Amino acid sequence: AHILGIKDMSGLIKPMAAKKLIEALKNEISIPIHLHTHDTSGNGVATLMMAANAGVDIIDAAFNSMSGLTSQPALNSIVAAMDSTERETGIDPDGIQEISDYWAAVRPVYAGFESDMMTGSAEIYKYEMPGGQYSNLKSQVESFGLGHKFNDVKDMYKAVNEMLGDIVKVTPSSKAVGDMAIFMVQNELTPENIYEKAKDIDFPDSIVSYFEGMMGQPEGGFPEKLQKLVLHGKKPITCRPGELLPEEDFDGIKKLLVEKYGLEGTEKEALSYALYPKVFEDYLKSLDKEGNFRLMGSDIFFHGLSEGETCEVKIAEGKELVVRLSDVRDADDE
């Protein structure tokens, strides 16, 4: 091994725990230690500083304007706090402030995608939900018409995790837990009644895939009774899922993309298709039908032009279009 990475995707490691962990590891191994965490609890900066004082080699942090909550702890604040200490970073505070200011101006453009989480929440220690999932779960719950039961879904997330054996929750296993939690709230299921009420119910694809072994084998194995209920007699795999994949025909994919879509057949295009064939084909169809929206400013793409507003669209090197919305009228009969 060249490096030891500690991925705390839910931001569960507390400051003193980080100190103890890093000190213990430093006493046993000589390779660099890299700590990744999230700031959902509000303790992220303290956690990284304790880890730094214990000798961690690498930490992940985010520019202040993009930090906190389900993101990473605040880089600018850490740099300032470590100034004039043994672990001084050497990072120019003015330089990173300039970059942070840039992202502070960009962020409002994407405000529609922000979670409505306004403050850190120590309840993350209760639910153990990854940062990225925590920020997306509410909109997912609302899409099922269960927004008024969001707290019930969070409680069920914890219950499902315990039903599965307190598993490592990171994509895709965290999605399986979340989907199962929503499914159980939807169908008024509980850990106690699920074996009777869900005998003939089709479970979410993600939880079926989990119990099939397609996400790997969890430490301690699967809970057999629940596995049998979910799979309805289907036999799970016991090997590494990747061993069952057929050899990918990349030359064939490149030929398809060239002949069907007129692409260059680059390695990047072939990999995109191999990983997400439907998503990539839908993207190509969108380009063909609607054009390349990447040429348009994000604010215009999301919100459109206001009357009298002008935007510039660079469609090629040295070729720029100026678009102005003069006015908006009701459509006529034709």
Where are the language model's segments positioned?
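Active-site beta-loop-alpha junctions enriched in small/polar residues
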Residues: 7-11, 36-42, 64, 122
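Surface-exposed amphipathic alpha-helices with a cationic face
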Residues: 22-30, 79, 83, 104
